[in-house]
Amino acid sequence: MLDKIKHEDILELRLARPPVNALSPELIALLHQSVRAAPDSGARAVVISAGPGLFSAGLDVPA
């Protein structure tokens, strides 16, 4: 759902919820938790990214 990749003092949080990286409540909570914890892990910056093609289609809205 969320890959955490450390690049020295930069933490990359890569969305990994194919096919469109829709933001579910669980993913939003995980993003929030990861950003809040980043300084404790030595990160001086956080970059939120996704795989090639599509960053995110937005919120995961039930039909």
Predicted feature residues:
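Glycine- (often His-adjacent) and acidic-residue-rich active-site loop
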Residues: 50-63
